[in-house]
Protein backbone atom coordinates (compact mmCIF):
# COMPACT_ATOMS: atom_id res chain seq x y z
CA UNK A 1 0.00 0.00 0.00
CA UNK A 2 1.08 3.59 -0.55
CA UNK A 3 0.36 4.59 3.09
CA UNK A 4 0.17 8.32 2.41
CA UNK A 5 0.27 10.17 5.74
CA UNK A 6 -0.14 13.71 7.07
CA UNK A 7 3.62 14.19 7.00
CA UNK A 8 3.91 13.42 3.28
CA UNK A 9 3.54 15.58 0.19
CA UNK A 10 1.75 14.07 -2.79
CA UNK A 11 2.68 15.46 -6.22
CA UNK A 12 0.15 14.89 -9.00
CA UNK A 13 1.40 15.47 -12.56
CA UNK A 14 -1.92 16.41 -14.13
CA UNK A 15 -4.74 14.62 -15.96
CA UNK A 16 -7.07 14.60 -12.99
CA UNK A 17 -10.10 15.21 -15.20
CA UNK A 18 -11.68 12.98 -17.86
CA UNK A 19 -10.10 9.85 -16.39
CA UNK A 20 -13.01 8.02 -14.85
CA UNK A 21 -16.61 8.25 -13.74
CA UNK A 22 -15.98 10.57 -10.78
CA UNK A 23 -13.32 12.97 -11.98
CA UNK A 24 -15.16 16.03 -10.63
CA UNK A 25 -15.19 14.39 -7.21
CA UNK A 26 -11.49 13.58 -7.53
CA UNK A 27 -10.72 17.17 -8.53
CA UNK A 28 -12.51 18.53 -5.46
CA UNK A 29 -10.69 16.06 -3.22
CA UNK A 30 -7.23 16.95 -4.53
CA UNK A 31 -7.83 20.71 -4.64
CA UNK A 32 -9.00 20.73 -1.03
CA UNK A 33 -6.58 18.26 0.58
CA UNK A 34 -3.58 19.27 2.67
CA UNK A 35 -0.23 17.97 1.49
CA UNK A 36 -1.26 17.67 -2.16
CA UNK A 37 0.42 19.66 -4.93
CA UNK A 38 -0.78 19.39 -8.52
CA UNK A 39 0.29 20.70 -11.89
CA UNK A 40 -1.96 21.30 -14.87
CA UNK A 41 -2.39 18.52 -17.39
CA UNK A 42 -3.76 18.94 -20.89
CA UNK A 43 -7.20 17.75 -19.76
CA UNK A 44 -7.39 20.39 -17.02
CA UNK A 45 -6.20 23.03 -19.47
CA UNK A 46 -8.91 22.04 -21.96
CA UNK A 47 -11.51 22.24 -19.19
CA UNK A 48 -10.25 25.68 -18.13
CA UNK A 49 -10.43 26.86 -21.74
CA UNK A 50 -14.09 25.81 -21.77
CA UNK A 51 -14.62 27.53 -18.41
CA UNK A 52 -13.04 30.77 -19.61
CA UNK A 53 -15.27 30.77 -22.70
CA UNK A 54 -18.32 30.33 -20.45
CA UNK A 55 -17.22 33.23 -18.27
CA UNK A 56 -16.90 35.46 -21.32
CA UNK A 57 -20.40 34.53 -22.50
CA UNK A 58 -22.07 34.80 -19.08
CA UNK A 59 -20.17 37.47 -17.14
CA UNK A 60 -23.16 38.40 -14.96
CA UNK A 61 -24.68 35.01 -14.27
CA UNK A 62 -22.09 33.04 -12.35
CA UNK A 63 -24.55 30.41 -11.16
CA UNK A 64 -25.30 29.64 -14.79
CA UNK A 65 -21.59 29.14 -15.44
CA UNK A 66 -21.27 26.59 -12.65
CA UNK A 67 -24.33 24.75 -13.90
CA UNK A 68 -22.99 24.74 -17.45
CA UNK A 69 -19.71 23.23 -16.27
CA UNK A 70 -21.60 20.11 -15.21
CA UNK A 71 -22.12 19.25 -18.86
CA UNK A 72 -18.37 18.59 -19.16
CA UNK A 73 -18.62 15.58 -16.88
CA UNK A 74 -20.44 12.29 -17.13
CA UNK A 75 -24.08 12.63 -16.03
CA UNK A 76 -23.51 10.14 -13.20
CA UNK A 77 -20.52 12.02 -11.74
CA UNK A 78 -22.87 13.63 -9.22
CA UNK A 79 -20.32 16.05 -7.77
CA UNK A 80 -20.98 19.62 -8.94
CA UNK A 81 -18.04 21.99 -8.69
CA UNK A 82 -17.89 25.08 -6.50
CA UNK A 83 -16.11 28.40 -6.91
CA UNK A 84 -13.42 27.60 -4.36
CA UNK A 85 -12.41 24.49 -6.32
CA UNK A 86 -12.48 26.39 -9.61
CA UNK A 87 -10.27 29.16 -8.19
CA UNK A 88 -7.73 26.58 -6.99
CA UNK A 89 -7.79 24.76 -10.33
CA UNK A 90 -7.25 28.01 -12.21
CA UNK A 91 -4.24 28.78 -10.00
CA UNK A 92 -2.43 25.50 -10.70
CA UNK A 93 1.06 25.89 -12.19
CA UNK A 94 2.38 24.28 -15.36
CA UNK A 95 5.27 22.81 -13.38
CA UNK A 96 6.67 22.48 -9.87
CA UNK A 97 10.41 22.71 -9.38
CA UNK A 98 11.99 21.41 -6.18
CA UNK A 99 15.66 21.17 -5.24
CA UNK A 100 16.11 17.67 -6.68
CA UNK A 101 13.30 17.24 -9.20
CA UNK A 102 10.78 18.88 -11.50
CA UNK A 103 7.14 17.82 -11.85
CA UNK A 104 5.52 18.57 -15.18
CA UNK A 105 2.75 16.96 -17.18
CA UNK A 106 4.29 15.89 -20.49
CA UNK A 107 8.00 16.63 -20.03
CA UNK A 108 10.44 19.44 -20.69
CA UNK A 109 11.48 20.80 -24.08
CA UNK A 110 15.02 19.98 -25.19
CA UNK A 111 17.44 21.96 -27.29
CA UNK A 112 19.44 20.52 -30.19
CA UNK A 113 22.12 19.26 -27.78
CA UNK A 114 19.55 17.29 -25.75
CA UNK A 115 19.75 19.73 -22.87
CA UNK A 116 16.55 20.67 -21.11
CA UNK A 117 15.11 24.11 -21.62
CA UNK A 118 14.21 25.70 -18.28
CA UNK A 119 10.41 25.52 -17.91
CA UNK A 120 10.22 29.14 -16.76
CA UNK A 121 11.65 30.20 -20.10
CA UNK A 122 8.81 28.56 -22.03
CA UNK A 123 6.61 31.34 -23.35
CA UNK A 124 3.35 31.71 -21.38
CA UNK A 125 1.48 31.61 -24.66
CA UNK A 126 2.89 28.16 -25.50
CA UNK A 127 1.75 25.84 -22.68
CA UNK A 128 1.46 22.98 -25.15
CA UNK A 129 5.21 22.40 -24.91
CA UNK A 130 4.71 21.27 -21.30
CA UNK A 131 1.22 19.81 -21.68
CA UNK A 132 1.08 17.94 -24.98
CA UNK A 133 4.55 16.88 -26.12
CA UNK A 134 4.96 13.12 -26.65
CA UNK A 135 8.65 12.98 -27.49
CA UNK A 136 10.00 13.32 -23.94
CA UNK A 137 8.59 9.92 -22.97
CA UNK A 138 10.70 8.05 -25.53
CA UNK A 139 13.35 5.86 -23.88
CA UNK A 140 16.02 7.20 -26.23
CA UNK A 141 15.43 10.77 -24.99
CA UNK A 142 18.10 11.31 -22.32
CA UNK A 143 18.25 14.89 -21.01
CA UNK A 144 21.88 15.73 -20.25
CA UNK A 145 21.80 18.54 -17.73
CA UNK A 146 18.58 18.18 -15.82
CA UNK A 147 17.30 17.44 -12.38
CA UNK A 148 15.07 14.39 -12.33
CA UNK A 149 11.95 15.13 -14.39
CA UNK A 150 8.75 13.48 -13.13
CA UNK A 151 6.04 13.37 -15.79
CA UNK A 152 3.00 11.51 -17.07
CA UNK A 153 0.63 12.40 -19.96
CA UNK A 154 0.93 9.08 -21.85
CA UNK A 155 0.43 5.69 -20.17
CA UNK A 156 3.67 3.77 -19.76
CA UNK A 157 2.06 0.75 -21.47
CA UNK A 158 2.60 2.50 -24.81
CA UNK A 159 6.34 2.46 -24.13
CA UNK A 160 6.91 -0.83 -22.31
CA UNK A 161 3.63 -2.78 -22.70
CA UNK A 162 3.44 -2.82 -18.90
CA UNK A 163 1.33 -0.81 -16.46
CA UNK A 164 4.17 0.24 -14.21
CA UNK A 165 6.28 3.30 -13.45
CA UNK A 166 9.45 3.65 -15.53
CA UNK A 167 12.38 5.21 -13.65
CA UNK A 168 15.37 5.98 -15.89
CA UNK A 169 18.62 5.70 -13.94
CA UNK A 170 21.71 7.74 -14.73
CA UNK A 171 24.70 5.72 -15.91
CA UNK A 172 26.74 4.36 -13.03
CA UNK A 173 24.27 5.36 -10.31
CA UNK A 174 22.93 3.00 -7.65
CA UNK A 175 19.32 4.18 -7.79
CA UNK A 176 18.96 4.89 -4.08
CA UNK A 177 18.46 8.64 -4.47
CA UNK A 178 16.18 10.72 -6.66
CA UNK A 179 19.36 12.36 -7.99
CA UNK A 180 20.26 8.99 -9.53
CA UNK A 181 17.45 9.33 -12.10
CA UNK A 182 17.09 11.68 -15.03
CA UNK A 183 13.39 11.07 -15.63
CA UNK A 184 10.50 9.11 -14.16
CA UNK A 185 7.49 8.22 -16.29
CA UNK A 186 4.61 7.96 -13.82
CA UNK A 187 1.46 7.33 -15.84
CA UNK A 188 0.26 3.80 -15.10
CA UNK A 189 -3.00 4.45 -16.98
CA UNK A 190 -5.11 3.87 -13.88
CA UNK A 191 -8.36 4.57 -15.75
CA UNK A 192 -7.46 1.93 -18.35
CA UNK A 193 -5.55 -0.56 -16.23
CA UNK A 194 -6.91 -0.22 -12.70
CA UNK A 195 -3.31 0.17 -11.51
CA UNK A 196 -2.56 3.26 -9.42
CA UNK A 197 1.16 3.91 -9.10
CA UNK A 198 3.16 6.15 -6.79
CA UNK A 199 6.92 6.74 -6.71
CA UNK A 200 8.36 7.54 -3.27
CA UNK A 201 11.26 9.99 -3.53
CA UNK A 202 12.55 9.01 -0.07
CA UNK A 203 13.45 5.42 -0.98
CA UNK A 204 13.02 5.54 -4.78
CA UNK A 205 10.59 2.65 -4.80
CA UNK A 206 7.39 2.40 -6.81
CA UNK A 207 4.25 1.24 -5.03
CA UNK A 208 0.97 0.18 -6.59
CA UNK A 209 -2.66 -0.23 -5.67
CA UNK A 210 -4.68 -2.42 -8.03
CA UNK A 211 -8.41 -2.19 -8.50
CA UNK A 212 -10.26 -5.33 -7.56
CA UNK A 213 -12.30 -6.72 -10.44
Model-inferred region functions:
Residues 6-7, 20-99, 109-110, 116-119, ...:
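Active-site neighborhood of divalent metal-dependent phosphoester bond hydrolases
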Residues 17-24, 191-193:
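Short acidic, Gly/Ser-rich segments with clustered Asp/Glu that frequently serve as metal-coordination loops
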Residues 15, 30, 41-42, 89, ...:
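Divalent metal-coordination and catalytic microenvironments
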